Amino acid sequence: TLKFFNNKLYCGSDGGIYVSEDGGVTFQDYTINGIAVGQFYRISVAKDDSGKMVGGLQDNSGFIRNNEVWNVYTGGDGMDYEVDPTNNNIVYGFVQFGDPLFVSTNSGQTVGTINSPAGNGNWITPLALSSEGDVYAGYDAVYKLNGNTWERLSDDLGNTPIDDLEVDPNNPLVLYAAEGNTVFRSDDGGITFTEFNVFDSGISDIAINTTDGSAIYVTTSNRVGFAQNQQQDLRGVFKVPAETNGAAGAVVDLTLNLPQDHAYFAIVH
């Protein structure tokens, strides 16, 4: 909303409260000192610097935190963002539906874009990096960035876009993808996928054991940003061991007494 009062222009937006004394030419941010107005969809932390991170905010672009300062480096709705594990000056970020991909090689000082492939992406299109810095994305299928072009690796996993995609940090040939209530696994770098485990409810996130890849952690619920009446009834947190032959072991329910009225998201760091 925009309102004039005492010759000042007040702006109330998803990003906060701003005031202009020159008719809208410049604005002063009145929410900069401690008023929390942003909601992160995703964050990623640099592997070698826990103080450096990137993240996508609903309606408030993509941010990078570097040298204890937050700065905007993309526009639109910030979605899935990643820091390159081999060089933390290289950062990536998706806006809505995964189009385009924002790329910066100097910690957000300058930014380029790469258009999405022909495949359809979710509102939050998953972005994943291998330990070697290879970039993957989940649209209707799994794609890998080759220079400035997306290369399609897999067939469609199902009838809808991929909900989450992760690369095993211990083995870049192992990828996990979630679509609906099913987790798929690839052992050949994302070319072929087989069914790994089926859950009773839709999957919101996957995280992989960072030590040895011996297990994945799965959360079931709709994603952050969905209204309460759109959330699924069956929500939980689960551990699924990964056997040496790539099969899923017995699922362990870790939900315990977590509240059932929230969306869940798993991070292993």
Where are these regions (language model features)?
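Beta-propeller blade termini and top-face loops
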Residues: 1-269
